[in-house]
A protein has these predicted regions:
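C-terminal or mid-to-C-terminal helical accessory/interaction module adjacent to the motor/catalytic core
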Residues: 80, 86-87, 126-210, 281-285
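Intrinsically disordered, low-complexity regulatory segments
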Residues: 1-153, 162, 167, 236, ...
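C-terminal helical "lid" subdomain and adjoining coupling/linker elements of P-loop NTPases
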Residues: 170-174, 189-257, 304, 454
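Accessory interaction regions appended to the cores of large information-processing enzymes
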Residues: 29, 38, 190-191, 203-206, ...
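Pre-Walker A segment
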Residues: 265, 269-290, 295, 301, ...
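Basic, low-complexity terminal or inter-domain segments flanking catalytic cores
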Residues: 2-5, 15-16, 25, 164, ...
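A conserved hydrophobic secondary-structure block that centers on an alpha-helix together
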Residues: 96, 298-300, 304-312
Length: 966
């Protein structure tokens, strides 16, 4: 029998397609890209390591030839694909029909080197009909699409690898720059600047409830007083909070009411008679929205479902791979003839002929740069499955997103909504005031009635309940005729303040990038994830708040490399990539122009070389906060975080404080808090100074004035740095404390990030009192360890969270690990990624797919090397050597040598309310220390053998303690 190998991107997609193809076909996944540019020096092949261009992974001297490598975690899988290819009679590359998919197919062809016929198969939905049609109509690999993807990858590498080191040297270590991420960051920063410069304006008006002779009531609002319009929000200047000036530099002719004036007017208007001066009614129609493209799906996923962009795309990916929707990365809103017929048929059957648009609706892409042709995102197949029919098949996220996609697709072929807009003006006169006669007033009342809902029966943008939304959209006014009188029954003064422009949410940032022509459907979610992962933005509710680091980075790029973060320039790069994809531009000349420059234009490489010396690191890191101007307070971004200074006084800026929330009173308060060094005295045993410090994560005490410090300990709740005594500081520095030995293991009392706890081997238990750390005994500790272990806020950790059973493989368990929930089958583990759900909604096939894609064998712990003898340490200011005291020694002296740490997932550093996780564990310096003899109460000297603080480079230690930049 003929054996045809079909390769797609993901295991889930492979399983769905294999069901449709049947015998004679083997469907395997590539698990994404199999090759890429080297991610580190370790991945660069030995023969290229000495090449000047090797770090880029691009030979800039040879037409930007890419150095592609198979990463270590893909080598085993690539070997498997090679074996399958060798046994196949034909190879079909069925990756996605876009640039990335075309590139994956090309890389597979290059790496597998098949000796059998090769075909390229493309489809936009995973249904039996679509797959069989694609098999019957193969094509060749589109080299133009491959060239465009290679150009995009090269651009990103050149931009990132050239610009990021500038940020490391001039702003802070470990920052990154990116072709799109830096522009997205600039958008966030510019919006925050608008908020920081914003000055609120205030005004008052009057809200009325009027009644007709028939006792029908309706709302109205005071709009004019003595023929002059009342001020509204649009009349105020955002920079001053005052009324805008007209062409003659005079404020606009409007009335600004104070609270007192508004209350006086309201009292004089209550129960007044008003006359209908005019009543207008105009019809309106509203057309349905086009079916979803990637950006609008992400925007509505956020507005309607509360999903982030990445969550939306994860759910959409699963729906696509399961055969429920069409391809989810598209900027075309068009529907195929088959889909149009399916939508129209469903409208007719579910809503009736009256709700069907007279003619099929055809939608064209708004973007002139719409990528390779796809359909809109819609339910898959020639007939759409209703959401109700899929309730038992889809997980929560998948069902809710499918419901959204289905409604939008069906509504796109429905009839227009029709209605009427009403506008009524009421004139009247106030009663006399104490200061004179009454005043003429004019009130406005507006209404909206929907006569025929049309497509709104199925879909209302921004709402999850169309019927409720329709009611909210209607404000019905009673029939009113000119000269008819009504009564102003209730008059309520209403105060208002202008609001700063709203921060970007994930949805509005996608909309903003799309409006600028920046990014593509495949990149929006990753851009948003990247700017958060890199520390340029943080979520506050649904808003994206730029960090101070983002301000400094954007300032540097705007002032010295303005073109690289220019919106038009970045959009032009997207257009150029489209031109390469269409075969109208060539990759190599384009990259040469970008990197080296041409026609008098300077490329990125010479630009950085010429600008580097001109960059004033202090200037770009100094941020002039509008609310602090004239106060002498400067805000800076140091190598270890943001801080402010006033003369010699410095203070860290809390990480959770948004830039626009830093006001002068708050800044003065932060600067007045204890900061800097507080000498407390000399430790009588070691001769080292004891110093109190204010760190980013709270106050702490430090033993020694050398760098790095000998020992540190955070203060307990209730301790005050300004009144802390030497005796108290020395007591804190005895922690971690060796309590004794239980079941052959040392028991330690420690103060950690989440409070006081006991540690025995790999087991730990929280205790209720910080002070108890100094007095807890072995019997009390053993009683604590006999209690069930609790994690977080009391959720007991007991066995797997869920178990997935399979007929063809061992069960997969969902467990809670120290780095979050993970899947395991006993041989491989796969951690659920950041932002993924807890796993409660995972289906068995999801668990299998994740484990197959990301599963890794647990790493075995390397055998420990023989510990080196610690060098003696000298006390500061003295020539004596501090000797090590045995734990069994009866003397209760406390000494300084490095201390042995019990194994624990998170090592508390400086007991300063923060922790160092596994990436820094390699920095731990182990020192040989004898264990305390069993069943002996430890002396004070045992503290010298307590868990060691992590031995870090001073730069890292400063970063974690939050020490102010010099």
């Amino acid at each position: 029998m003929t054996n045809i190998l079909v390769i797609v991107e993901s295991p889930a997609k492979a399983r769905t397609i294999e069901k449709y193809l049947g015998k004679g076909y083997t469907v395997e996944s590539s698990i994404g890209h199999i090759r890429d540019l080297p991610r580190s020096a370790a991945e660069i092949p030995e023969k290229y390591k000495n090449e000047a261009w090797a770090r880029l992974g691009l030979n800039v001297e040879d037409d930007f030839r890419a150095l592609y490598v198979v990463s270590a975690d893909k080598k085993q899988h690539v070997a498997k694909l090679k074996r399958l290819t060798a046994d196949a009679d034909e190879l079909i590359l069925a990756t996605d029909d876009d640039r990335e998919g075309e590139s994956i197919a090309w890389h597979l062809l290059q790496e597998l080197k098949p000796k059998v016929p090769v075909k390229r198969m493309v489809f936009h939905e995973i249904t039996r009909e679509a797959i069989l049609a694609a098999i019957a109509n193969p094509r060749d690999i589109d080299t133009n699409l491959v060239e465009a993807q290679e150009a995009r990858r090269a651009l990103d590498r050149l931009y990132g690898y050239e610009v990021s080191p500038v940020l490391w040297r001039k702003v802070a270590p470990k920052l990154s720059a990116g072709r799109v991420q830096s522009v997205a960051t600039r958008l966030l920063v510019q919006r925050e600047w608008e908020r920081m410069r914003f000055v609120s304006g205030s005004w008052w008006d009057i809200e009325a409830v009027c009644t007709t002779a028939d006792q029908a009531s309706f709302p109205a609002r005071l709009s004019e007083l003595n023929g002059v319009r009342l001020a509204q929000g649009r009349d105020f200047d955002a920079a001053t909070g005052r009324l805008k000036l007209g062409p003659d530099d005079k404020p606009a002719a409007v009335v600004t009411l104070s609270e007192a004036q508004a209350r006086d007017l309201a009292s004089r208007l209550t129960n007044s008679t008003l006359t209908v001066a005019s009543a207008e009614e105009k019809p309106f129609t509203q057309k349905p929205y086009p079916p979803f493209i990637t950006s609008t799906l992400q925007q509505e996923g956020s507005r309607k479902l509360g999903f982030g962009a990445q969550r939306t795309m994860r759910a959409a990916q699963k729906l696509y791979e399961g055969g429920y929707i069409t391809y989810m990365r598209t900027d075309s809103p068009n529907l195929s003839a088959e889909a149009m017929n399916a939508a129209r048929s469903q409208v007719k059957s579910m809503y009736g002929d009256a709700y069907l648009s007279p003619q099929p609706r055809i939608y064209a892409a708004k973007s002139k740069n719409a990528q390779e042709a796809h359909e809109a995102i819609r339910p898959a197949g020639g007939s759409f499955r209703t959401p109700d029919s899929l309730r038992g098949e889809l997980d929560s996220d998948g069902w809710r997103l499918y419901d959204l996609i289905w409604k939008r697709a069906v509504a796109s072929q429905m009839a227009d909504a029709r209605g009427r807009r009403m506008q009524v003006r009421l004139s009247g006169q106030t009663g006399d005031s104490e200061n004179g006669a009454g005043q003429k007033v004019l009130l406005n009342a507006s209404g909206r009635a929907i006569d025929f809902p049309g497509f709104l029966r199925a879909y209302v943008e921004g709402s999850d309940d169309p019927n409720a939304a329709l009611e909210d959209r209607e404000v019905i006014l009673p029939p009113l005729r000119v000269s008819e009188t009504v009564t102003g029954k209730v008059m309520t003064p209403s105060g208002h303040e202008t609001q700063p422009p709203a921060r970007f949410t994930e949805a509005s940032l996608v909309q903003g990038l799309e409006a600028q022509g920046i990014g593509r459907p495949s990149t929006y979610a990753s851009i948003i994830g990247t700017i958060q992962d890199r520390g340029y933005a943080a979520k506050k509710g649904s808003a994206l708040v730029p960090t101070w680091t983002a301000f400094a980075t954007s300032a540097l790029l705007e002032h010295h490399f303005g073109k690289l973060v220019d919106y038009d320039f970045t959009a032009k790069m997207e257009e150029d990539l489209d031109e390469i994809a269409g075969g109208r531009k060539q990759r190599v000349p384009y990259l040469r122009s970008f990197y080296l420059g041409d026609n008098g234009g300077m490329g990125i490489h010479p630009l950085i070389e010429t600008q580097m010396a001109a960059i004033d690191a202090r200037a770009v890191a100094t941020i002039e906060v509008p609310k602090l101007v004239g106060s002498g307070i400067e805000v800076r971004v140091g190598r270890y975080g943001p801080y402010m200074s006033q003369g010699e006084v410095k203070a860290n800026i809390p990480l959770e404080l948004a830039p626009d929330e830093l006001t002068l009173p708050l800044a003065l308060d932060l600067l007045s808090r204890p900061s800097g060094d507080h000498p407390l005295g000399i430790d009588p045993e070691s001769g080292l100074p004891v110093i109190g410090k204010a760190g980013r994560f709270g106050p702490y005490v430090q033993l020694g004035d050398t760098l790095p410090p000998t020992r540190t300990a955070s203060l307990f709740p209730g301790d005050d740095l300004s009144t802390l005594s030497l005796e108290r500081a020395l007591k804190l520095l005895t922690l971690p404390r060796l309590v004794g030995v239980s079941e052959g293991e040392e028991v330690w009392a420690l103060n950690g990030k989440f409070g006081p706890y006991l540690k025995r081997g790999t087991d730990s238990r929280s205790i209720t009192s910080h002070e108890g750390l100094f007095s807890v005994t072995i019997p009390e500790a053993e009683e604590a360890f006999r209690q069930p272990r609790f994690k977080g806020r009391g959720s007991a950790v007991a066995g797997p969270l869920r178990t997935f059973e399979y007929a063809d493989r061992t069960a997969i368990l969902l467990k809670s690990g120290r780095f979050g929930p993970y899947l395991t089958d006993g041989e491989r583990n796969a951690t659920l990624r950041k932002g993924e759900e807890s796993g409660a909604d995972l289906l068995p096939e999801d668990a299998r797919s994740i484990l197959e894609e990301r599963g890794k064998e647990p790493q075995k712990k390397p055998s420990k090397a023989a510990p080196k003898k610690a060098a003696p340490r000298k006390a500061a200011g003295k020539g004596t050597t501090v000797s090590k005291t045995s734990a069994s020694k009866s003397t209760a002296s406390r000494k300084v040598p490095a201390r042995k740490a019990p194994a624990r997932p998170v090592v508390s550093l400086a007991d300063s309310g923060m922790a160092i996780h596994s990436p820094l564990k390699s920095a731990v310096k182990k020192t040989a220390v004898k264990k305390a003899a069993p069943k002996k109460t430890p002396s004070r000297s045992a503290a010298a053998k307590a868990p060691a603080k992590v031995a870090l480079a001073w730069a890292d230690l400063k970063a974690h303690l939050g020490v102010l930049s010099e």
